[in-house]
């Protein structure tokens, strides 16, 4: 199963990168690239029915958030997903972290001010 997900992610990476003008943004902790995070979430979440996320979608969102260990990483991830949410093909992703009930997840909302989101997370840490 994980091998097929990997193949799907790589395929999406190759196909969607030029289409989305995706930026290869490295998270500050060096664990992932923006395009790979986008591909992982897109491949897992766009098959949902009626706007309700399924377990694979929630797992993918949790997974990309889990690898971001710093405030700067959260900012990069937030901006990373801002890029694809501007595209009408990916509006189904809006609000998915909340629907999956993932605490402190980077919001998927094109109206999110990523700097304010990170500031809010920073304040919760202290």
From Swiss-Prot:
Keyword Coiled coil: no
InterPro entries referenced in this protein's UniProt entry, alphabetically: Bifun_inhib/LTP/seed_sf (IPR036312)
A Gene Ontology molecular function term of the record: lipid binding
SUPFAM superfamilies in UniProt: Bifunctional inhibitor/lipid-transfer protein/seed storage 2S albumin
Disulfide bonds: 34-80, 45-57, 58-100, 78-114
Signal peptide region: 1-22
UniProt entry keywords in alphabetical sequence: Disulfide bond, Lipid-binding, Signal, Transport
Transport as UniProt keyword: yes
Function (record text): Plant non-specific lipid-transfer proteins transfer phospholipids as well as galactolipids across membranes. May play a role in wax or cutin deposition in the cell walls of expanding epidermal cells and certain secretory tissues.
Family listed: Belongs to the plant LTP family.
Protein name (record): Non-specific lipid-transfer protein 15
Species per Swiss-Prot/TrEMBL record: Arabidopsis thaliana (Mouse-ear cress)
């Amino acid at each position: 199963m994980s091998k097929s997900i990997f193949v799907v992610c790589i395929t999406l990476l190759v196909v969607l990168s030029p289409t989305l003008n995706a930026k290869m943004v490295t998270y500050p902790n060096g664990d992932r690239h923006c395009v790979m995070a986008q591909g992982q979430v897109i491949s897992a979440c766009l098959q949902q029915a009626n706007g309700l996320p399924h377990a694979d979608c929630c797992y993918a969102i949790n997974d990309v958030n889990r690898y971001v260990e710093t405030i700067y990483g959260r900012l990069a991830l937030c901006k990373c997903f801002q890029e694809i949410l501007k595209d009408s093909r990916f509006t189904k992703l809006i609000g998915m972290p909340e629907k999956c009930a993932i605490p402190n997840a980077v919001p998927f909302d094109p109206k999110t001010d990523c700097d304010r989101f990170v500031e809010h997370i920073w304040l919760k840490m202290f």
